[in-house]
Amino acid sequence: MAYRKRGARREANLNNNDRMQEKNDEKQDSNKIQLSDKVLSKKEEIVTDSHEEVKITDEVKKSTKEESKQLLEVLKTKEEHQKEIQYEILQKTIPTFEPKETILKKLEDIKPELAKKQTKLFRIFEPKQLPIYRANGERELRNRWCWKLKKDTLPDGDYDVREYFLNLYDQVLTEMPDYLLLKDMAVENKNSRDAGKVVDSETASICDAIFQDEETEGAVRRFIAEMRQRVQADRNVVNYPSILHPIDYAFNEYFLQHQLVEPLNNDIIFNYIPERIRNDVNYILNMDRNLPSTARYIRPNLLQDRLNLHDNFESLWDTITTSNYILARSIVPDLKELVSTEAQIQKMSQDLQLEALTIQSETQFLTGINSQAANDCFKTLIAAMLSQRTMSLDFVTTNYMSLISGMWLLTVIPNDMFIRESLVACQLAIVNTIIYPAFGMQRMHYRNGDPQTPFQIAEQQIQNFQVANWLHFVNNNQFRQAVIDGVLNQVLNDNIRSGHVINQLMEALMQLSRQQFPTMPVDYKRSIQRGILLLSNRLGQLVDLTRLLAYNYETLMACITMNMQHVQTLTTEKLQLTSVTSLCMLIGNATVIPSPQTLFHYYNVNVNFHSNYNERINDAVAIITAANRLNLYQKKMKAIVEDFLKRLYIFDVSRVPDDQMYRLRDRLRLLPVEIRRLDIFNLILMNMDQIERASDKIAQGVIIAYRDMHLERDEMYGYVNIARNLDGFQQINLEELMRSGDYAQITNMLLNNQPVALVGALPFITDSSVISLIAKLDATVFAQIVKLRKVDTLKPILYKINSDSNDFYLVANYDWVPTSTTKVYKQVPQQFDFRNSMHMLTSNLTFTVYSDLLAFVSADTVEPINAVAFDNMRIMNEL
């Protein structure tokens, strides 16, 4: 504010002075009203006088500016200091946890594989009618049936064909059913005399087409009329007739023989419930004993730690633990009947005698205390331990109550659960604020990177037995690893589970409050003592809280199916010590335990994720092995790993670092292939030629000659340049030729007038116009290819001259015999033989597959007040 120069307007009249006085009074009143607002507001305002005729010298201006600068600096320093000190005072509400609904939904939407119902048989082939041509190229009236590919997408090029077979294998793995019930897919045979059924709609349509074909023998027609199912009710078995290519039959017969369904009975359901929940006296379980004999289930695949994602997969492990944390947060029960926040704060104020005090540090004890924060803290602690998520502590050193609450936290939660830096900071604050001042010891100067924590150093220096004993317990507070039901569990110390450790903590706190704090002022000592008093007044409730925390953690832990590996996570869950204070101060005497429905839901979600995880590992391992055995040297393994992660649903694959992707690939390579997947691959591998020859898209090679060769008659095409075998020709593998780039051998053979056969998958191109074929000299095409050494552009021309060609009669009339310097090598497709294609498939007549085994269990709990912990004493004893 600018200063007025004294005596500047003494000659002004009295009336004017009176008016000025009134204005000043009004200004002061308004200033008083706005003062509180201005102090609390964060806006920086420049306060100036009203515009009056006041003369100010340059010197006064300079001095005013300097004073203003100094004042601003003081205010800024004070403001920053206040921000630091009053952080928790100003923060009246603590941010609550917002569950990521998308991740939770992704986890809960993972269902067992049996949700995929098989409605038809697996088929690669289908029979098709092909024309027959006479010796002169004319088409006959009769047709022949041959097996062709249902979905003919075979590419050209040996490598691409092998890649096609890998994709086919992937498709089979995707469609491979866990169980087959033929009765569900059977359809009526239209040509049956007694309304019999065949196995599926495609078999029925094939039978219909063959029955209507004029070429079909009478015996075959009579057989089709007799085709029907054969039921053996006493054995719960039914046989259905089917028409399948031998390879398709091999696939479907394998699926039928290797179904994953197993008989379901009450013992299986009983053993499916986690043992600790079965044996927990707080849960009353009843089972429906009316299971039919046809009940079936699919045993979940719960193999452990095949990839060890906790080891060197930081990003993946962080995502898994985050998902588990979000799931656990959603099922931890809410605290009930907490102490009224207002009543508790009022009582604490009375204990602190705040009316008679103006010590700011003690008013901080009450900040941030609310029931929402208490509930939030309870859920965070249990969920973090269940998911093994690392926590970080948020606190202000000047709030002694937070630090005293932190002492309870460090007593009951193992050190491993906190990130090292946060644990050290909290322990150092407790040591330098409470423990060392109590005994008059100098501040601990902690060196960053010291292998020992502040509590470990303090344990060696403190002479007081009770305090040193408590420090020793905290320093050695680690999870105990135990394998229960085949799952690695992180178990709490028995002293924590029973709540006895709280007495140890209270003894240490009482010893600290009795100390003299010789180097500190009286107010400081009194503040610490009153903070300890507030906590010690709730000894019974703290014991109960510790028992309640341990019971809920262990009960929910029984529903975890994957090993609880403990590794520090990349990201942490923040925990504010004011929320710990809220929990300690507001916990009531109402027991909360998870409801049976919540437990079963948590267990089912864990089982489904774990089972899906193992099945996707099996798929990825099978695909990687298949790619290696098919010699797919260009195949990017990273793509297989990415696909594997996508099928687990919870990962953002694009954000996973490459080094972890390749490490994952290496781990997947070391795993053995699951037996069913291996057998299926061997079926494909043994029948690659059969599948390839059924394609109309590709030929198996080409014969190149220097001189023209006559076109030959073929029943399937007429006059064509097709060779049905390679006898008498020297063979060269086309893929190896293209990879080596050495074409000298071909050139020399052609110049010596020796035809050469290039063996490999080539496009099977047809052009029916003879005129256009004559215009294309394939000899010059191939000469150019050999000359330029671009065999990968090889596209042999198929001459096909028959009565379907536009120029058939032109050729016939002039008695012209066409020739070609190339012959396309094409294997003969397999002919359809009804007798060899008719197979009987056998399955159970009927059974019911149950996906949710726990639906048979009706469960209830005892009254929460009567709930007991592992020591057969009530969880909450304080009433």
UniProtKB/Swiss-Prot annotation:
Residues 1-79 are annotated as: 5-fold hub. Its main location: virion. One of its GO terms (cellular component) is T=2 icosahedral viral capsid. Residues 1-35 are annotated as: Disordered. It is found in: Virion. Sumoylated with SUMO1 and SUMO2. Sumoylation of viral proteins seems to have a positive role on viral replication. InterPro entries: Rotavirus_VP2. Inner capsid protein that self-assembles to form an icosahedral capsid with a T=2 symmetry, which consists of 120 copies of VP2, with channels at each of its five-fold vertices. This capsid constitutes the innermost concentric layer of the viral mature particle. It encapsidates the polymerase VP1, the capping enzyme VP3 and the genomic dsRNA, thereby defining the core. Keywords: Capsid protein, Inner capsid protein, Repeat, RNA-binding, T=2 icosahedral capsid protein, Ubl conjugation, Virion. It comes from Rotavirus A (strain RVA/Human/United States/DS-1/1976/G2P1B[4]) (RV-A). Residues 393-413, 421-441 are annotated as: Hydrophobic. This is Inner capsid protein VP2. The record marks A219, F223, M227, M838, M840 as: Interaction with the intermediate capsid protein VP6. One of its GO terms (molecular function) is RNA binding. Belongs to the rotavirus VP2 family. Residues 19-30 have a biased composition (Basic and acidic residues). The N-terminus binds RNA. It is necessary for encapsidation of VP1 and VP3. The N-termini of 10 VP2 molecules form a cylindrical hub underneath each 5-fold axis of the inner capsid. It comes from the Viruses. Homodecamer; each decamer is made up of two conformers of VP2, called VP2A and VP2B. Interacts with a VP1-VP3 complex. Interacts with the intermediate capsid protein VP6. Interacts with NSP5. Interacts (via N-terminus) with NSP2.
